[in-house]
Amino acid sequence: EDILINNIAWALRHLPLFGVFGDGEYRLQPIYVDDLAALAVEQGKRGENVVIDAIGPETFTYRDLARVIGEIIGVKRPIVSVPPALGYAVGWVIGKLVGDVLITWPEMKGLMGDLLCTDSPPAGTTRLTDWTREHKDTLGVHYASELARRKNRRKAYENL
């Protein structure tokens, strides 16, 4: 289960609208965790030093990713552009309500900086849209907490 994808679906299921930071036109190329694991094992066996862009076969803008997830899970919400500072503030409030850190400022800047997209060929084969269709009935039903998955729930965020 991917936290970002699950929580986009959660927000679409539970909030009256979905906000994207800025214009939402920054891109992502999500890779399925099993594809990433297989890639790591394959490269570990080779013993070479290589740099691989671990990306999946589909490219989305953030706005389109939210729209596609909503369509697949059967939830239509307005997708609205919000100033980054407002989006961060709303994320902070929702984070407090769910007992998590919804998004950090560096994560938001990286996302908006188009850092999750390259021109490399995909390293994974599993399409996010296919995976989402397979999990549409359970995706986003429950919030997935980043902090609950950590043994030390404060250490990674103390310097942010």
Regions found by a protein language model. Give the residues of each.
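Flexible, glycine-rich beta-alpha linker
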Residues: 1-9, 26-27, 60
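Short, solvent-exposed polar/charged micro-motifs at secondary-structure junctions
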Residues: 1-2, 30, 88-93
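Short, glycine/charged-enriched secondary-structure capping and boundary segments
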Residues: 3-12, 34, 67-69, 96, ...
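Hydrophobic alpha-helical segments typical of transmembrane helices
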Residues: 4-7, 107, 127
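A conserved pocket-lining segment of Rossmann-fold NAD(P)-dependent short-chain dehydrogenase/reductase
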Residues: 10-31, 35, 39-48, 53-55
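Residue-level signal for threonine
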Residues: 21, 104-107
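Mid/C-terminal beta-alpha module of Rossmann-like enzyme folds, strongest
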Residues: 39-104, 114-160
